Amino acid sequence: MIHKLMRAATVMGLLVVAGGLGSTDVLRADPKPPQVIQSGFESTDQLLKDVERAEKAPLYSAWIVESSRFLNVPHRAFQPDVGDPPFVDLPVNVGIIKDPNGEITLYDSGWKQLAYIFNWNNSCCWKGLRDQMEAIGLDPGDVTRIVLGHGHWDHAGQLSEFPNAVVYIQKEELSQIDFFLDYPVDFNAGHIRAVNTIDPLTGQQVGPPQQACARSPVCGYPPQTVQEILGKTLGGKAKIIDGRHEINAGLIIHPAFRGHTYGSQLLQVNTARGQLVFGSDTYSAWTGIRDWLVANIQQTDTIQQFLAYEKCYVLTSRLNSFDNCISAHEPTTYTAAYPITSNWWNIPNGNCSRAAELILAPGESTHVPANPDRTPPSQCVSVIPPHPIIP
């Protein structure tokens, strides 16, 4: 013990000589943030260089569409630091990015496992992504890439709807899926299964047995979603990457490992309003990244999440800052309160789903209808499945 104290005293003495813990030189000696995987490291200088390079690239157009909507979610379950209002509706947003050549990159793909939507969740307004794109004047046949922010069921559910598109997925995300395929749902005499489907006070079944993992990370990867992802990887339609990856000039993937899942990733897009950064659930709420709030603590490493916030702040620092951070589940999406999504409308024949035009490149015509339907969500909620439940 004495030796340990002496070593500690020696170290503290050296720190004092060097100028203390806050010394600029000390900080310069370790410029990398405390990220857990080497390929996830990106310094501020590296990120700013990506911005400078991207600003010389062609400009992209961007939209989002609402794949579906969670209803009446307890606010503190989504953002523990926020409790007003006590319940919120959360969209499930998909990014659509069009390059000057007309090719389209999707960021996420929404969901398709309708049993999750209408049986196991209080949700509404589902519509197939291809139908949504056609309804707003975009050709699904032009989709050549899908960048998967992460592989959960509400984000990776419609990959197979775009058979010619190549999916960009982090090696770390596949590692997480592999791990969770053997997750011990029945461990300890079925305790995990029991606490998720049985009311401990009455002993009554309160959820379907298939939902037994609802509070464990494995539930993000149900069989249908795993099939969607593995279908692409085994079918030669996936590009498995490890960290930062430049798809094209002005279109760059940045790792956000453990920010939400093992292999979460951001997508930087060069536009006329600066760099947009799509974040999926790494910053599932724009108000979260704006106000530096924890989100979705059940499946998030908070330190890595905040490091992802920092990446978006740096990438958007030259123009519009965090207003250019695009989240998947921001409750104020499709309102003036989330400025970049304020040019929104209800998708025609879209089962009450919505779209927003974020920014147009020069020469791209608007896709907003001449007389857009902006019926408030409270007056347009469809909880009816558009076709029979898919098990």
Describe each PLM feature range.
Residues 67-68, 109-112, 151, 173, ...:
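Active-site metal-binding loops of divalent metal-dependent hydrolases
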Residues 64, 94-99, 103-105, 114, ...:
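Core dinuclear metal-dependent hydrolase active-site scaffold
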Residues 1-10:
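Bacterial N-terminal signal peptides that target proteins for export
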Residues 9-20:
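Bacterial N-terminal signal peptides
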Residues 120-169:
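Active-site metal-binding motif and surrounding structural segment of the metallo-beta-lactamase
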Residues 30-33, 264-266, 270-391:
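Cap/insert and terminal regions of metallo-dependent hydrolase folds
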Residues 49-50, 127-138, 142, 171-255, ...:
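Metallo-beta-lactamase
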Residues 26-104, 111-113, 120, 318, ...:
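Zn-dependent metallo-beta-lactamase
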